[in-house]
Amino acid sequence: MHPLLTTETGTVRKKWKGHLPVALLYPNTYPLAVSNLGFQLLYRLLNASEEIVCERFVYPQNREPFRSLESSRPLMDFPLVFGSISFEQDYAHLAAMLVAGGVPPYAADRPGKIAAGSPLVVLGGVGVFMNPEPLALFADLMVIGEAEPVLPRLLPALAALTDRRALTEIGATTPGCYVPSAYSFRYDSNGRVREISVSEGLPQQVRRVALKKSDQAAHSEILSPDAELGMYMTELGRGCSRGCRFCAAGFIYRPPRLWSADAVLDGLSQRPPEVDRVGLLGMEMADPKLLDSIAGFLQTNACSLSFSSLRADRISPRLLELLSHSGLKSVAIAPDGCSERLRGVINKGLSEDDLIAAAVALVDAGIYTLKLYVMVGLPTETEQDLEEFVQLVQKIRQEILPIGQKKGRLCELILSVNSFVPKPWTPFQYLSFGGQERERAMQDRDCTAAVLNLKKKIKYLKKAFARVDNLHIKVDRPDKVLSQAVFSRADRRIGPALLDIGMGKATFKQAMKKHKLSSWQYAVRPRGNDELFCWQ
């Protein structure tokens, strides 16, 4: 047993005899893995099967042995390997974990017989059903969609499977199951997808599978003092009805679903009594009736509340009361676009008045640290849009500072400035990373202008806020974000580069050059409206 588990609650330990061993990989560190609700949910669903013993693997740190957390067994002892992937920057980690476990990283190199030593690799998670192709070479099977409706049918089929070549039957009969080896791609001279060929009997398009309703909201199954978030999490629903044009989650989790108050309270009621901090996922969907139910539960159980961010136009008196009683010290609001015009372009639907009113209401409720999240590099963005954001921040300060002073408190603003990355399945999937006009983007074959354009915008905002008291600005590095933009819309040709990066054999730039891949092709090149995408 890993030392980290001595302080963990919710660990599942099963005897191996008579059970099918399943490894569950999370391609990042333990603190992030144990904070990921999707990873925890999959761990519970797999171990809920009487036929399965599931143990977790996380990305190894400091050259520690690559063994399962529960029993310290090597990956080669598991005939079935699941991977839960959420973020593009973890793709290379996944490839490295397979190699560290002694598993041939490419599915094509694994023996036909499925057994310990030559396991079947199944990948899923939001990163996979957004765009499975960057990881297609590493997977025998991929799950396109949410786990709950797929696993009851998939797990018995996998348990009975002995030959990798029989996977096509699962792909043909099980909704949401994608067998990458059964699909081949042809590209034109410009590197764009020209044609997708499919093996006989398989669907031309594997449609995403979604959970229709839930009697119990997904919640933390495992708690650890080493978790990144350090709270008990409960999901209020999935998806979002707002339709912001940049947001992948708002499109790939369609239709938006808000769980019933009974389902949410059932999830909250699983909280260990000694845990008094609750995190809610999906606050932007919560209606007044649900908030009332949650508020009653939290007050009765003396719990405090936390969440990732709030919509500025959904801050009700009941929510403010709940926040005030929770002793929350900071709240994040996401304008996303720098100006009201840009927020219209991205379909955010927030006015300047909404944002100022939200800031005032939050400070009035005793929350003196406000975080504002904004993107640069959005389509049609100009310096005027940046200047309007500077003015917005100044107006917010003018409104909230006197309120804080009357209460003897300093108000603090934290600005998070991030480079916009176009995502699959969104209306912005056709756009260029870097925010350049189409003609300039077509000429920017080394991506230098895209990165410089973003750096220029970030520098403008940093300079504007450099001498402002009680204001902190956090920015990303566009040259580093470029790799995320590449992986986001990449196809399976990126696989060898991911393997080299994961094994530490090359930097991102070196790997792209070695394998004759173009960052411009994936990240900066504008797409045509009639283009065929690999994720389709």
Where are these regions (language model features)?
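Conserved SAM/AdoMet-binding glycine-rich loop
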Residues: 25, 265-371, 375-412, 422
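Glycine-rich beta-alpha loop elements in corrinoid/cobalamin-binding modules
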Residues: 59-197, 423-491, 500-502, 506
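Flexible glycine/acidic-rich beta-alpha junction loops that bind and position SAM and/or redox cofactors
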Residues: 184-187, 289, 318-319, 341-346, ...
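Iron-sulfur (Fe-S) cluster-binding segments and ferredoxin-like electron-carrier domains
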Residues: 246-263
